[in-house]
């Protein structure tokens, strides 16, 4: 038996991504596809919490193709303005990105990403940019294989989690790979930490965790068996576990 279920590596990656420019349009495979086509690797399920963004910001989530045939045609013919779907976002939004979801972060957006511990990414489009004088590698065939058609609706792709009850573990998303919570601390709260671990990222404000001062930008892990967690102050925390 291993600490992290069926693997000896930590099951999640937590990243802060500060996109200065528009990032490439990409998609990730699921576990089954990655196992066959990527030497037994895991696929990638991830989610984004918008830490900050420009006014009237958008993000690429999903696409506008109705069938696999239309998807293939749009990609092979470079009909990117028809294919790519952008939706509006604001600070405090949460987006779940399942395998098969076309996605990309736009410039001027700061996000907290929680993901499966995998690095399998298929690049669909990179705005014809050059790297060392050459176009960056694209993964067209594999992308077409794994992209979900039709895409999840825009309305179901993003939700605002800015105004949730204070001093409680607010569940943002649960899947077989991770559980994501948002905690808005105002004054004092306690909870029992019985999960295998809990990653904690302070996304705003400052406070005290069991006597230890923390502030915006701090990351820490509450291990299994930590027991009673006492949070004090005025702060927001995004927490993740499995």
Question: Which functions belong to the PLM regions below?
Answer:
Residues 75-120:
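Loop-centered beta-sheet repeat module
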Residues 9, 17-22, 53-56, 101-121, ...:
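Ligand-binding loop in jelly-roll beta-barrel domains
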Residues 1-3:
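Short, small-residue-biased leader/transition segments that mark boundaries at the very start
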Residues 15-19, 42-55, 63-64, 175, ...:
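Short, conserved beta-strand element in jelly-roll/cupin
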């Amino acid at each position: 038996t291993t600490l992290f279920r069926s693997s000896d590596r930590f099951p999640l990656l937590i990243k802060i991504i500060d996109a200065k420019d528009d990032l490439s349009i990409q998609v990730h495979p699921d576990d089954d596809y990655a196992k066959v086509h990527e030497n037994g690797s895991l696929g990638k399920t991830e989610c984004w919490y918008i830490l900050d963004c420009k006014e009237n910001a958008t993000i690429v989530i999903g696409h506008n193709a109705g069938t696999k045939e239309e998807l293939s045609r749009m990609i092979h013919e470079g009909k990117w303005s028809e294919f790519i779907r952008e939706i509006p976002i604001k600070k405090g939004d949460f987006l779940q990105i399942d395998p098969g979801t076309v996605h990309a972060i736009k410039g001027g957006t700061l996000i907290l990403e929680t993901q499966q511990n995998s690095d399998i990414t298929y690049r669909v489009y990179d705005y014809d940019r050059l790297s060392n004088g050459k176009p960056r590698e694209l993964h067209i065939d594999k992308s077409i294989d794994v992209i979900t058609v039709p895409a999840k609706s825009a309305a179901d792709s993003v939700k605002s989690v800015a105004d949730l009850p204070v001093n409680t573990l607010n569940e943002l998303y649960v899947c077989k790979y991770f559980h994501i919570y948002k905690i808005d601390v105002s004054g004092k709260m306690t909870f029992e930490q019985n999960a295998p671990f809990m990653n904690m990222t302070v996304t705003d404000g400052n406070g005290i965790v069991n006597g230890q001062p923390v502030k915006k930008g701090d990351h820490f892990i509450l291990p299994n068996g930590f027991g009673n967690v006492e949070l004090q102050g005025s702060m927001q925390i995004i927490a993740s576990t499995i």
